[in-house]
C-alpha cells in the first residue's frame, strides 16, 4: 500500500495511510492500555459542532489550515469508494460546501489548497488506480469500518 504520501507533507497523512491499509485488507486493533501523546495546536475536546469547528480554525496557522484542507480533499479523491460516495453524497456535499463557504468568506488563502488539488488531478487519478488495484475489501466492508 506504500508509505505516507509525500505530497501530503503533514496533516491527514495518517488518515490516508489508514484508509489505504484498510482497503488492502489490513486490520487495526485497539490496545486499551496504550498511551499516546499527540500535540494538536488547535484541537479541542468536547463539542464538535460547527461553531466549535470555526473557533478551532481561528486558532490554526495558515499552513495547518492549507495542508489540512488540501490533504482532506486528496484523501477523498484517492481513497473513497464510489459506491459509498454516492450513498453519502448529500452529507459530503453539505460538509464541503460549509467548509468552502467559510474559507471563501474568512480565509481565502486556504483555498489555494483546492487549486493545488485541481492541478494534481492527473497524479491523483494515477494514485487512485494503484490503490484500487490493491483493494481486498469491498465498499460495504469499508463502510462498516467507518461506521465503527
Please state what every model-predicted region is.
Residues 1-42:
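A short, conserved alpha-helix in the catalytic core of glycosyltransferases
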Residues 9, 60, 102:
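Conserved aromatic-histidine-acidic binding/catalytic patches
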Residues 10-13, 68, 93:
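Hydrophobic transmembrane-helix microenvironments that flank and shape a buried ionizable site
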Residues 12, 21, 79-80, 101:
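Transmembrane helix irregularities
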Residues 14-15, 23, 58-59, 74, ...:
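Catalytic-site signature of metal-activated, phosphate-bearing donor transferases
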Residues 16, 53-57, 92-93:
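Glycine-rich loops and low-complexity Gly/Arg-rich segments
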Residues 34, 38-84, 108-124:
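Catalytic core of nucleotide-sugar-dependent glycosyltransferases
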Residues 81-148:
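Non-catalytic, C-terminal membrane-associated alpha-helical segments of glycosyltransferases
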